[in-house]
Amino acid sequence: MGKKKLALTKKNLKQSIIEAENWILLSGIQNSSKKYFGSVNAWYDPKKKKYSFIYSEINGYFLTLMVYLYKRSKNKLYLKRAISSAKWLIKNTQKKNGGFSCLTVIDKHSSHNFKKDLIYSF
C-alpha cells in the first residue's frame, strides 16, 4: 500500500502556517528567563529534559523570520521577539572583531562545549 498524498489547498496551507507561527511563538524555544531572555534554544535533550546550549546561528534565523512575519502581518509581537533576540546576541555573543560566539553553554556537560570558544565571522 502506498502512502496517501495530502492535497495542498489554500485552506490547509493557511492552517499549517498558523500552526507553525503558533509553535514558534508558544513552544518555549525562545527564552523568557532573565539570564537568557530573548535568545533561542538549540538542541533539546529529552533524557535530561533541558536544552544544551543557545546557538547564535539559530538566533539569526529566528530574528530574520520574526522580521519577515512582522513585515507580512504588521503584528508587533514578531518585531518585539526579533528585537529581543538581536539584543541578546549583541550583548552576550558579539565579539570586538564583529563576529559572534558559536554557542552559549547551558548544560556544562553537553558534548558541544568544545564549540564555546569558536567565533562565527559571517
Predicted feature residues:
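Glycan-recognition and catalytic cores of secretory/periplasmic carbohydrate-active enzymes
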Residues: 1-122
